[in-house]
């Protein structure tokens, strides 16, 4: 549980729980799996605006590559008081030698507007993502 925790003037609240689900294989070639749950998550800015979220994710770490794969979903209320959901439809993958997500698809569904689909690509270590909103596609460099 976060208490009196701030980052650059933003107050962060909530309860984060990690549960180790298990390890398979050997230390040289194995897989860790754990669940991460956020309850009552809230970030409040210096001007007292805030957003909230709750999430459940499953994280898998593969050895020896330290490739990390994440699945799951979240929901909350944005800065304007509108509900949203986030669903990882294709696992988000991070590789040890890359600073960005290298593959996976994330869907963001804010209330009252079209769903946003964020595609991180096919595994190449680059800064490129594609964002699709309705029939419009945007190529974005992170």
Feature locations, PLM:
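Short, low-complexity, Pro/Ser/Thr/Gly-rich segments in the mature regions of secreted, periplasmic
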Residues: 130-142
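Short, isolated positions in well-ordered beta-strands
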Residues: 12, 84, 115-116, 138-140
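A generic structural signal for short, solvent-exposed coil/turn residues
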Residues: 28, 78-80, 98, 110, ...
């Amino acid at each position: 549980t976060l208490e009196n925790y701030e980052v650059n003037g933003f107050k962060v609240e909530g309860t984060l729980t990690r549960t180790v689900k298990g390890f398979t294989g050997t230390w040289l070639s194995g897989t860790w799996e754990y669940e991460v749950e956020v309850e009552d998550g809230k970030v409040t800015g210096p001007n007292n605006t805030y957003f909230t979220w709750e999430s459940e994710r499953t994280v898998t770490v593969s050895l020896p590559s330290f490739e990390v794969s994440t699945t799951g979903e979240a929901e909350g209320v944005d800065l304007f008081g509108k509900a949203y959901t986030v669903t990882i439809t294709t696992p988000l993958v991070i590789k040890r030698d890359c600073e960005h997500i290298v593959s996976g698809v994330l869907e963001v569904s804010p209330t009252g507007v079209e769903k946003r689909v964020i595609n991180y690509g096919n595994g190449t270590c680059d800064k490129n993502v594609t964002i699709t909103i309705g029939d419009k596609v945007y190529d974005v460099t992170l």
